[in-house]
Amino acid sequence: MSWLQVVVLSVLQGLTEFLPVSSSGHLAIASRVFFEDDAGASFTAVCQLGTEAAVLVYFARDIARILKAWFAGLFGSGERSPDYWLGWWVIIGTIPISVIGLLFKDEIRTGARNLWLVATAMIVFSFVIAAAEYAGRQTRRVEQLTWRDSVIVGFAQCLALVPGVSRSGATISAGLFLGMDRELAARFGFLLAIPAVFASGLFSLPDAFAPVGEGMSATGPQLLVSTVIAFVVGYAAVAWFLRFLVRHSMYWFVGYRIILGSVVLILLSTGVVAAI
């Protein structure tokens, strides 16, 4: 892997991780279109450590408040606060992707990164996002969340294991279908992703140096620089996206996903780009 590839893919990871456009799908597409080789699931997972560190810093006060309330409720007595229960909902919601990610890790690293699948998922899931935006009541608040919401959003997060779907797109859509407003759905989805993505990145760290199957390999310094770039760009992206959701819908991203997916399908059909 060249330094140009590291910089381009890391910036792309930071820009797209929190938007409902699929960062892993973008990395798979960009690496094949411009560099004629897949970045690999392991490099992608390690690169995501930078963007998840960004969301960890951005939500530091929220996380500290939730942890404080969770431990206080766990070992104390009296009425439990909404933050106490939110801590439990994050834990419960992390279980589905932890189990499914381990069971299907080999498929995720290899077959799931086929560009035919990525482009198709990009287009098909666009209609799910549009339906969620159209049907969502957007009236429920954080204190109204239950363990059922956590389980449903947790299983929605599992869809992001398929490049082209989008973790934020899946969790925000699930939240909208459950009646959450856009900002709550995004915040809850981002909190839910932190433990899962950190675990995935650390687990994939050894494989990033020697990818399983096809994929570029990266050196230690390249992985470090990649993580730092993804952190800086990702922090700016999450701050912008949460402000965007307050005033705007996700229909903007639906159109973008359909156009990008269609372009990739055309490139694949004409033989300009290889699927694997």
Curated annotation (Swiss-Prot):
It is found in: Cell membrane. Its EC number is 3.6.1.27. GO terms for cellular component: plasma membrane. One of its GO terms (molecular function) is undecaprenyl-diphosphatase activity. It is an enzyme of class 3 (hydrolase). Pfam families: BacA. It is a multi-pass membrane protein. It catalyses: di-trans,octa-cis-undecaprenyl diphosphate + H2O = di-trans,octa-cis-undecaprenyl phosphate + phosphate + H(+). The chain crosses the membrane at residues 1-21, 39-59, 84-104, 115-135, 159-179, 190-210, 222-242, 253-273. GO terms for biological process: cell wall organization; peptidoglycan biosynthetic process; regulation of cell shape; response to antibiotic. Keywords: Antibiotic resistance, Cell membrane, Cell shape, Cell wall biogenesis/degradation, Hydrolase, Membrane, Peptidoglycan synthesis, Transmembrane, Transmembrane helix. It comes from the Bacteria. Catalyzes the dephosphorylation of undecaprenyl diphosphate (UPP). Confers resistance to bacitracin. Bacitracin is thought to be involved in the inhibition of peptidoglycan synthesis by sequestering undecaprenyl diphosphate, thereby reducing the pool of lipid carrier available. Belongs to the UppP family. This is Undecaprenyl-diphosphatase.
